[in-house]
């Protein structure tokens, strides 16, 4: 369950994204000073990098929206990747019918209007639909790229290097600077600091940096702090303007 007894702290109206992300993590680290533990891990992820990657992949727009929207639903997301690999969402009968209609309309007067739309406009829509079905190899390749991306896990000071090698390998026009991350220290006090591309899938409102702190006490690993950036949550809750925000919560019943 994500419902817990918590104490939260946040920066509403965040103006300096990177500094404010660092401030939230630093405040989280300070809150550990009175806790007794032998070791722990600060895990950092970033939902924004995933969404940018998806936007650059060679798949139909509807698939980009689908994958970004359901990133946080891990089981369903895995099912989507399987469908992407097999083209199981594409009905060959419907595709063939669309092609026939398209070829028939090519012979008609382009200025004619059907149901409020010109033949020319309808042809453009048909052309897009016909081109949408993917070659099987393309779907498999895109799924492979996404799966490999989500397996990236490394010390935080190697995050930019590992990501950039990955982007270069698959000829993705994207470069990440190490300064993009809130810290480059692999160890802070008793905590190992790692970067994980698959972390951040627990709550759908995160939009950028996400993190958690787990500590080891009495041979048990316990989650004590979770947080991240949620730049759209306040507008989703009714605000007329977008208000950037970043925050975290300390679990009281860990």
Where are the language model's segments positioned?
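Positively charged, Gly/Ser-enriched RNA/tRNA-binding surfaces
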Residues: 1-37, 89-254
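Short C-terminal domain-edge/linker segments immediately following a structured domain
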Residues: 17-19, 39-41, 72-75
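Internal, well-ordered alpha-helical segments in soluble enzyme and binding-protein domains
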Residues: 24, 28, 46-49, 67, ...
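Short glycine-rich phosphate-binding loop at a beta-alpha junction
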Residues: 41-44, 194
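Hydrophobic mid-domain F-helix/FG-region of cytochrome P450s
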Residues: 27-35, 48-58
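Acidic, His- and aromatic-enriched active-site or binding-groove loops in soluble protein domains
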Residues: 58-90, 215-217
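Beta-rich nucleic-acid/ligand-interaction surfaces
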Residues: 43-56, 199-208
């Amino acid at each position: 369950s994500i419902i817990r007894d918590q104490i939260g702290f946040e920066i509403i109206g965040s103006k300096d994204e990177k500094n404010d992300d660092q401030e939230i993590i630093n405040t989280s680290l300070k809150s550990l000073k009175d806790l007794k533990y032998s070791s722990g891990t600060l895990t950092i992820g970033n939902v924004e990098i995933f969404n940018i990657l998806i936007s650059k992949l060679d798949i139909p727009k509807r698939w980009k929206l689908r994958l970004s929207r359901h990133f946080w639903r891990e089981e369903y997301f895995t099912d989507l990747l399987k469908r992407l690999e097999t083209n199981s969402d594409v009905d060959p009968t419907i595709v063939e019918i669309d092609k026939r209609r398209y070829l028939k309309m090519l012979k008609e007067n382009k200025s004619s209007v059907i149901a409020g739309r010109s033949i020319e406009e309808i042809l453009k829509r048909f052309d897009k639909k016909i081109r949408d079905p993917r070659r099987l190899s393309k779907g498999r390749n895109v799924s492979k790229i996404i799966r490999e991306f989500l397996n990236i896990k490394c010390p935080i000071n190697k995050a930019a290097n590992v990501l950039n090698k990955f982007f270069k390998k698959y000829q993705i026009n994207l470069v990440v600077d190490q300064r993009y991350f809130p810290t480059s220290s692999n160890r802070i006090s008793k905590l190992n600091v790692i970067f994980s591309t698959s972390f951040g899938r627990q709550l759908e409102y995160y939009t950028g940096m996400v993190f958690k702190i787990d500590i080891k006490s009495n041979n048990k690993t316990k989650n004590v702090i979770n947080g991240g950036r949620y730049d759209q949550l306040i507008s989703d809750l009714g605000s007329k303007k977008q208000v950037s925000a970043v925050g975290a919560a300390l679990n009281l019943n860990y």
